[in-house]
Structures are given as structure tokens and as C-alpha cells.
Amino acid sequence: MATLACRVQFLDDTDPFNSTNFPEPSRPPLFTFREDLALGTQLAGVHRLLQAPHKLDDCTLQLSHNGAYLDLEATLAEQRDELEGFQDDAGRGKKHSIILRTQLSVRVHACIEKLYNSSGRDLRRALFSLKQIFQDDKDLVHEFVVAEGLTCLIKVGAEADQNYQNYILRALGQIMLYVDGMNGVINRNETIQWLYTLIGSKFRLVVKTALKLLLVFVEYSESNAPLLIQAVTAVDTKRGVKPWSNIMEILEEKDGVDTELLVYAMTLVNKTLSGLPDQDTFYDVVDCLEELGIAAVSQRHLNKKGTDLDLVEQLNIYEVALRHEDGDETTEPPPSGCRDRRRASVCSSGGGEHRGLDRRRSRRHSVQSIKSTLSAPTSPCSQSAPSFKPNQVRDLREKYSNFGNNSYHSSRPSSGSSVPTTPTSSVSPPQEARLERSSPSGLLTSSFRQHQESLAAERERRRQEREERLQRIEREERNKFRYKYLEQLAAEEHEKELRSRSVSRGRADLSLDLTSPAAPACLAPLSHSPSSSDSQEALTVSASSPGTPHHPQASAGDPEPESEAEPEAEAGAGQVADEAGQDIASAHEGAETEVEQALEQEPEERASLSEKERQNEGVNERDNCSASSVSSSSSTLEREEKEDKLSRDRTTGLWPAGVQDAGVNGQCGDILTNKRFMLDMLYAHNRKSPDDEEKGDGEAGRTQQEAEAVASLATRISTLQANSQTQDESVRRVDVGCLDNRGSVKAFAEKFNSGDLGRGSISPDAEPNDKVPETAPVQPKTESDYIWDQLMANPRELRIQDMDFTDLGEEDDIDVLDVDLGHREAPGPPPPPPPTFLGLPPPPPPPLLDSIPPPPVPGNLLVPPPPVFNAPQGLGWSQVPRGQPTFTKKKKTIRLFWNEVRPFDWPCKNNRRCREFLWSKLEPIKVDTSRLEHLFESKSKELSVSKKTAADGKRQEIIVLDSKRSNAINIGLTVLPPPRTIKIAILNFDEYALNKEGIEKILTMIPTDEEKQKIQEAQLANPEIPLGSAEQFLLTLSSISELSARLHLWAFKMDYETTEKEVAEPLLDLKEGIDQLENNKTLGFILSTLLAIGNFLNGTNAKAFELSYLEKVPEVKDTVHKQSLLHHVCTMVVENFPDSSDLYSEIGAITRSAKVDFDQLQDNLCQMERRCKASWDHLKAIAKHEMKPVLKQRMSEFLKDCAERIIILKIVHRRIINRFHSFLLFMGHPPYAIREVNINKFCRIISEFALEYRTTRERVLQQKQKRANHRERNKTRGKMITDSGKFSGSSPAPPSQPQGLSYAEDAAEHENMKAVLKTSSPSVEDATPALGVRTRSRASRGSTSSWTMGTDDSPNVTDDAADEIMDRIVKSATQVPSQRVVPRERKRSRANRKSLRRTLKSGLTPEEARALGLVGTSELQL
């Protein structure tokens, strides 16, 4: 028996965001593993030895020397390859160890759960740590991608502001550095769509990082270029704009000049075009870009002095590729040399928010180049946002100069020239300022360039110092990667945000003059944008006097001063900016930490350093002469005005984290629509109440907590619905008149779900009972309840399998008992009458509606006569008077002891189903009174009605007790598959291997923890002795993770169809039964006949009677022939209405409903809802462990479908019950007694009466047929043959064939048989197979660019390695030209297809113009 004795340790990573990389204990103990036993059976011993804090089901084993995870299902002998090198020394005499830690799937689930349920500081801390988590464990990336982690990142990023998006992009960049992560991004096009959407953000750092990630994506493989085109088309089509609009808005420099973004955007276009295999796709992309005006943009940059060489090179590459594809072979290849550094300046990147003079300039240039009608893309905001006018530009420039902005003032030409009037230079103000600097007026002279170059060395030195400082801060951050430190960091960041908000509000007063005359005087939202906050800070700093010392809080509005000041410093020298990793991760993290510490003024070194950097930034602004702050502010003024107005209109506190990019986030939110419900149910948590949250965050924190109490995960599914819900809350409160919790949305939701919302006022007897639960504290609703309510708001069509409930409309949501009773409450006591003259009694009160006026009060008796019925029956409704008896009897007859119903004049005329009264539509029946008087004459001793009382006998229950659990398990094993088959079946939810009964039996055999421990200890103590069958079975079951959750989920899946059918079919039967009774003529004939008979026998003139009396009709017999009253009713109906039916065959749905307990059905429906919600919890628990993605997706879709179907069932149930109440009103039931009517009993009475009626009717028809046959028999009885036929003297008539009842039946059968023979001939259906479209795909070519990714497997890998990889990728993409100097030869679908630019310039033939629909347009005229 081979063993392995080695050191064991555990790693406390139960919380992935609060974990450490150092295993414990520092002096690890030894554990002896058996190499012939599965590791899963020995895991409990390791767990017990280490006393690890992990849950045993969540544990796994990892080797310390190579980080490989061991398979718990296999033995050590089977995993010898993984143990290679394990016995070697780890250095300094230490041995390697086996580490017990949390399974990858559990950690990933915890990560996603944390991201999905966190907000505020917790979410910031989690996103901040995500990149480091992926760096610490490379295996986590694959699990994260498989578990839909990318979808979670997109969803969180779609709802967050730019700071959170920067954190997410950092983590996404780390994911994409791994092949597993890149493959996950390739397979999930939503990620690329989100990245492309972020290009339209107004925050420069977000745009820059998104562009870098897209560059890495396209550079990775040529096959990724079509995926990018697919994502671009999907996003822009949903926005209603032309594809590649976001890229063009960057190239058109909508929000200022930023050469770095221009280079990235143009490189992305070139890389995408170079990876396209076919010419059609190439021209589709190029034509879109040409329509958007890339030709004019390219010429403007190429003709402009001082344009960055990298940008010039990328523009030339595009032009060469286009000309080559058009067949122009005379073009020269693009220049191969590239500068190592590029110029960059700070601005707000294009978000498509407004279109200024630059856009109009491009349209005019397009008209001149015969491109008028095809290039007019508009973004959704282009029509509403105003554009800059020349006079506004002059006003703004004057205000900037008057306000004391030295950097801008120094950069203005001394000639004081205003906006150029030439068409070629009408650009936005930032571009105008740059053109003025680069114009031949003398600004860009050689001395100015020398001055710029002399400052480049100083900037380079400062940049290197800053990088070293940031790296040091990053190392400190990594060493302090603990929960408390992160919590402190998040708290400091939150305080910084609060102070920045307050400082921004204070600065707004100083910046009033910066806005245009029509703009609102509030620039507070500017402080939430990195670029706009930079610009605002620069304005306010320069506005103050030079001698005024600046408080350290002056830079509080800048969330990331270093990461934004760095490209500012590099603008003039054309230096290479720090790429993805450093720019995204180190600069941002270090800068935020530094700003927080400067705010706290703890280390004086940090404060002085921050002050020095702020001064350096001012120097950079003056040296660069770029006025990036001014350009950023001026170009975003109108957008900020628009957002400020939007934020003032929004009165709810749902967005406490600052101003968000609503347009971009809205687009991001639209990307994920199919998976949101499943994500919510899989990862939803219960939120803490506001009292449990921390209370030290100031007013903004309290506002956020109160908003979170209302807007939980259900409202996060669609943020627009959350806004509308809170805005319409006041409107909804008007409808809820009787609710005490008016200010609580939760209370409103509770009332909505319980059905009390639409009731309004209630009867006086019910008021005290209904007010009690309102005053009780409302139970907090879970996230599942919120998500469930959200799903209820938009249910599917009312169809369950093949059962159609679509005729249940919204009017069935209203219970006539609630509405009508509420509106007609019994009025309070009338006021006392005024004193009358001479003390006479007051006049009687006026009559109620149509009732007969009461008689005058005799004398001084003021007591009115007692009412005929008790008070509850009337409830304030006037009763229709009962007329005088219409029959006069000479003899005393027996009485029918029915309950007379006197119809009320109830105000339910608006309800279609109880608008009329059944009894009012019945026709009066003429009865033979003399015969009835004879038949039902009362004798001296009246017959008492016999009552059948069924004695409820108690059913004896046989209770079988298991004497030994082992015997019970062994008996159960006889009907179950083998244990190994059971385990595989449970893990795979294999319905063929295990049926429903087997699952229920296994549920009774689930081992307890005590049993599991005893079996494992016994096995380890006596390894040679095999376990018994019961013990082995329990041990096999215990090795299945989340066994109980799996079994309950599986049981629900297998039970659901049957349970749903048991609920839906009775509801459909009840609905159909109501329709059958309402439209049944035979029932009307029976009731009218019975009413006429009863009125004669009772000597009354009743209008109706309760249908419960139908139960007694067969028991009442006449006193002469002892025949039942039903027999006489049936006889009259058959005689008076020969076309009536047997009734029973027409109300089959009522008969089926009579067998259903509808109270139990309602309980089953509630139980289905509870089990469905519990199944989500079970699936959540199972998903933590190893579960196939396909299986998880299938189960998630199944549970989502179940939830929707259960909601439909609840709606159907409510509406059918309300319709049944309306039906009872229609049938004449008094309103006060309707709630007491049992549906099962009512249907049973109708069904049993119909069965009795059918039996009686058959007997009556048989007697009638016998009499008819008897009459026919009498026609020939005694006649001789000589009286007729040939024996008679007269000519005989042709013999007529007797055509009795049997003949009619035979003839009908004959016709039916002929019809069957005609229709049963085989029909030939012509089925034309669909023509298959033959498609050809071009073999993918290998990427010519070398893809070398050097990764360090050591655990001490830092951000520098990842950032260096990202830098090398982006640098190679932007600087190194393609090895193919001449673009590739693409396959052509048409030999003569050219680009749109070439086609329009070379002119169109009349035939081509007509084909394109351009006849008569300006293109032909030009």
C-alpha cells in the first residue's frame, strides 16, 4: 500500500477579495496520503488536521510548486505527472506542500456574486482588486469566463460611472492577456459591443483604454476583424446611426484635440481592414467610413502642419490600401519609419453629444467632392444639442482671457484675430485655437519649436520620476492587499468624492462667467469627469491671484491628476504615453491613493509632492500652449448644460455616484437583455436595510442608502424602469386610499401582490379586520421577490402548453365584490330631523331608488316596521319588489323549501358578465295548475324531506417505522440503479437513469454529517475491510457536492410539468364551465320551469331561487304517483322545448371541476412559486461547484420559463376566480353570500343535478317512444290483409316505408359513413424542399504579425509585466507598419466593384444612376 507523506497547508481564500497569498500555518504539519484512494475521500482528514475555515464541500487541493489543482475524483497514483518535481527542495531547505483552498468555481461564483450585489465603496474595492486577483491565480480566468463573468462585468459597467469603468477595463485587459480570456471575449460578442460603445464615452481615459483593448483584440487574430465589424454594426444599428460613427467622432475631434486617440482610432480601422478576407466586407466598411466623411478628415490632418507622424502614417496606410483595392497600382507604400514618441494633449474625447462647425464643414466639403446625399450621419443627440456659433466662440475666448487664464492668454495671437472666415478652417474652438497656433502668422516659429524641445527633457525627467513613484505606490498597495486596507482606501476615496463635490459646488460661483449667456450657471457635474475636472481646476487655479496660497483641497476635484497630467506633459514633445497597464492600473491606483493622502494631510511629503505636481501641470499648460483645459471645458459646455438640466429634473436619489454618461450607459445596458434575469436570480442577494448600513458617510451616503433600500437588484435590471417607478410613486399613492404606508414602495408592492390595492374602501364589517395587517410592520422583501415582481410586470401571453387563457382580459382583474361593495357601503345614520311645528312627527324618509314608499307612520309611532331580510343581505342596495301570486289554488299543496332570491338593483352595470340577470331573461312558463294541484296535494301528514348525512368515518392510517436505517437503505437499493450510476445521473440530471420515484427515495437516504464522519473514520481505521452496501452507498452520496440542492432541483424539474397540468387544467375547466352554463339554453328551460312550478306550489311570485336547491329536486315527490319533481320538470321541458338537450353532455367542464378542490389548487400554486424560488437558490449553490455550462444554461432557462409560467398561472387563477364571482352574481346569488360559496360544491351540485336530469330525461323519452311505437302498432292491429294491398278492390297506393325513430338514426348513420368515406381518401401534399444556398468560406490565413506573449509563471508577477505586454502589442500595432507593404488580394464577388469614393468621383452612367435611385438628385447635377 503506497503512501505519500507531505506537508499540508491551507490558504484562506473563502473571500476572494479578502485573501492572502501566504499559506497557513507557517510550520505545516505532515499528512500521509494513500495513493490508491481517491483524494476526495481523504480530504476530510486534511481539513480536520488543519482546522481550516473552509466548508468541506468547497475545498480542493493545489500543489505549491506548480500551482496545479489535483482531481479529487482520482487517486494520487493516477496523477503522477502533476507530482513531478514535487519532492524537490523549494529552496533554503524547505519542502513543497499540498495546499487546501477553495475550489475555483466557488471563488469565481463568490467574485461574481460580490460584483453583482455590491455598490458604492464595496463595489469600488471589488473592482479595484479584480485585476490583482486574476494575476495571482491564472486558472481563475478560465473559470471566470465560463461562469459568465464577462457578462457580469458588462452589466456592472453599464450602470457605473467612468471610475468604475476604468477598473473594469483594467481587469478586462488582464483577462485578454490570457488565451482563455481572449477566447472567451471572442465567443461573447457582447464584450466587443460594450468596448465599442465605450469609445463614445466623454471620458478620455475610458475611450483610450477601450481603444487599446480593441486594438489588442483585432491584432490577436485576423478572424477577429469580422467579429469587430459585427459588434460595430449591432451597436450603431441599435442607436440608429451609421456604423463606425463612434470612430469618426474621434477622428473629427468633436471634443478637442488628442493626437493619441486619433492614432489609436485610425490604427484600429487599418487593422480591421487588413484582416478582412473578402472584398465585399472591405468595401462595406470603407463605404461607411467614406459616407461619414473620412476623406475630408484625412485631408485636413494631412494638410495641417505639425500633425503627428504616427497619425500621418496611419492615414497614409488607409489611403494606400483603398487605392490598391480600387486597382491603382501606382501608389507608393507608406513610410516605414515611425517616431518613438507622439504628441498628446488632454481633452474630453468625442461622445457624439453635439455637432459644431466642424461637422457642417465636412458636409460642405463632401458636396464639393460629389458626396452630398450619402454622408449625413447623425447621432441621436445631434438635433437637440446646440452648436457653437462664431460669436459664442469670441465671447468665450474673451471671457477666458478676462478671467485670468494665463495659459490660454499666452497662447493667443497678439493680432487678436477672431474666427477665420474661410470655409476650410471652420472648426470647433479647440481646433481653432490649435490652427491659430499652427497658422503661418508666426506662432510656430523655429524659436518656439526650440523652446518646446528644450522643455522636453525636463518633462521626460518628471515623467520618469512619476513612474517610479507610482510603481513604488503600487508595490506598497500589493503588499497591503488586505481587506482592512482596501476598506480604508475605499473610505478615503468616498470622502474625497464628497469633498470634491463640495469644492466643485464652491467653485461653480467662480466659474459662472465661463458659460454662454443662455447656459445654466452650475458647473458642478464637471467635477465628476476626469478631463472636465482637470479643466475646471485649471480655470479656477489660474483665476486666483498668484500670491494666494492654494489649499491642498484645490485638487480634490481631480480623481486622477497624475494619469491625466501625464499626457498633458507629453503633448509638445510627441512622447509615447504610458500604455494600457501603467496608464490604466498603476497611474490610476497610485494617483487616487496619493490624492487621498494629500487630502488627509498625513505625510507632508505627499502634500508637497502634490503641490509640486499641480504647479508642474500649470507649467505644462503654459509650455504646451494647447489650452487643453479650456478646450475641454468649452467643448463640453453645452453637454454639461444638458446633463445639469437632466439631473435637476430627476428628483430621485438613484444616482448618488455622480453624473453618469447616460447615453453610453444606456447603450451598454441594451447589450445584455437575454441573460439579465438569469444573472439576477443566480447571484441575487438580500440587501441590508438602511439601519444596518454604516452611517458616517454624510448626506450623500444616507441618500444612497435610502435609494438602495428602494432600488434593489430588480430595479437594476432596467434602470429606466426604476426611474419611472419612483417618479410615478406619487401618482400611484392617489389610487391607494386606504394604505397607511404611503411613502414606502415596498408597502405598495406588498399591497399590490396581496390583491388589496384595487379594493378601495371596504364594507364596515370588514374594515377592522383589514386595518390590522396594515399597521403591522411589513416584512422586508427579498431580492427574489423584487425580481419576481419585475417579471410579473411584463408577463407573457396567457397560454399554458396547449391551454388558451387569452380571453381572460383586464376586466377580470377586478373583483365585482370588492369594487361594487366598496362603492355602495351602507350609509351612516342620518342626521336627526329638524324640529317640526306643533311637535308632529317628521315625514318618512324618501324611498330607496325604485322601492315602494313605506306607509305613513300612524299616529305618533315613530318605530318603522321591521325589514323583511336582515341587514347583511341588502347592503344598501334596493330590492326589486316581489309581485302578487299569479295562481289561485283550491287545495293545499306541498311546499318547496327553497331559498328565494330577490334580485337587487346593484350598480355593476359596467361589468359585462353581471350586467344582466339570468332570471330576468327567462321566459315565463305556462303550467297545468290543475294537474299540479292534483299531483302535489298536501295530505294530512306531510312527507318530510329525507336528508342524506354522510358519516365522516376516520380513515385509519398504517404507520410503518423503520427499525434500522441500514435495512431501509438496503431495501431502497433494490429498486435503484447501482450507486456509481446514481452519482453520475445526479451530477448530469440524467432522467433516463433515475426517475421521479427514485429521486424521492434518495431524498430519504441523504446522509447526515455525523453518518458521513463515522463512515470515513471507519474506512480510514480499517482500510482493508470493505464497507457494507448501505455504508458504501451513503459514502458515494456524500461525495456529491450540494446533494440535497441537486435532488430538490431535479425533483422540481421532474414534478413541474405534472404539477402545472394539475393546476392549469382545472382552471381551464372552470373557465369553460362558466361559459357553458352562461350560454346553455337547456339550463334556462329547466330553471324557468322549476321556478313556475315552485311559485304555484308555494303560492308566491318569486323572481329567483338559489341554485343549491337543485340538490333537493330529485327528492321531492308527488303524493299521487310518487314520482319525483325532477320527473315532472323533465316532462314539461321535453314537451315545451323539444330541441333541448340532456344538459349533462353539454357541461363536461363543470363535471370535471366538481372533482377538484380549488382551495388545495391555490395552495399548490403557492407551493409551486415557493419551490421555483427555492430552485434558484439550489441552482446558485450547485453553480458554485463543478457544473457544465450547458447544463447550467439549460437549468437557468428552465427555471426562468417556470417563473414566467407560474406568474401566468397566478394571473389566470385570480382572473378566473373574479369571473366566477361575477358569474354567481349573474346566476342570482346574493352578494353577501358569494364569498362563502365553495366552487367544488357548486359545480358538484350542478353536475349531479345534470346527471339526474339526463337519467330522468332518457326514461321520459323511452316512455314517449314506447307510446309512439304503441300508436304505430295500433294502426295495424286487427286489420286484415284484404283491407289493403292487391287484395283490396281499389288500386293500392305504393307502400310507404315506415320511417320511425330508428329509421332517422339509420339515415343519419348512413350519411355520416358517406362523409367519412369522402374525407378519408389520402391527400397528397406537395412539399417543395427549400433550396439550399451554397456558401463558400475562405480559409483563414495565419496572422503575419508575430504574436509572442512572454508570461511569468512566478507568483510575484507584477503589473509591469502585464503592462509591458499590453504596451508592446499596442506599440507594434500603432508604430510598426504591416509586413505586407502591398495590401492583400481579396476575393471579389464582382470584378468591377470599386469603392464609393472612386465610384462617385469617376461618375455614373445613366443606367447605374437609375439602378441606385439617384435620378434627378444633386449628384448627377454636380
Curated annotation (Swiss-Prot):
Q: Which residues form a coiled coil?
A: 448-480
The cross-references to SUPFAM superfamilies, in alphabetical order and at most eight, read: ARM repeat, Formin homology 2 domain (FH2 domain)
Compositional bias per record (Basic and acidic residues), positions renumbered to this chain:
450-464, 604-624, 637-651
Name the Gene Ontology molecular function terms of this record.
actin filament binding
Query: Mutating residue 865 to L: effect?
Result: In CMH28; uncertain significance
Which residue range or ranges hold the FH2 domain? 883-1279
Domain named DAD is located at 1359-1391
The reply to whether Methyltransferase figures as a keyword in the UniProt entry is no
Q: Which UniProt keywords apply?
A: Actin-binding, Cardiomyopathy, Coiled coil, Cytoplasm, Cytoskeleton, Disease variant, Phosphoprotein
Positions of post-translational Phosphoserine modification: 345, 375, 763
Basic residues compositional bias, start-end: 357-366, 1264-1278, 1385-1400
Q: Which Gene Ontology biological process is one annotated for this entry?
A: cardiac myofibril assembly
This entry carries the following GO cellular component terms, namely: cytoplasm; cytoskeleton; Z disc
Domain spans labelled GBD/FH3: 18-411
Changing residue 371 to R has the effect of: In CMH28; uncertain significance
Report the residues modified as Phosphothreonine: 775
Listed under subunit, the entry gives: Interacts with nestin/NES-based interfilament (IF). Interacts with SQSTM1; isoform 4 threonine phosphorylation disrupts SQSTM1-binding.
Q: What is known of its domains?
A: The DAD domain regulates activation via by an autoinhibitory interaction with the GBD/FH3 domain. This autoinhibition is released upon competitive binding of an activated GTPase. The release of DAD allows the FH2 domain to then nucleate and elongate nonbranched actin filaments.
Q: Which family does it belong to?
A: Belongs to the formin homology family.
Q: Which protein are we looking at?
A: FH1/FH2 domain-containing protein 3
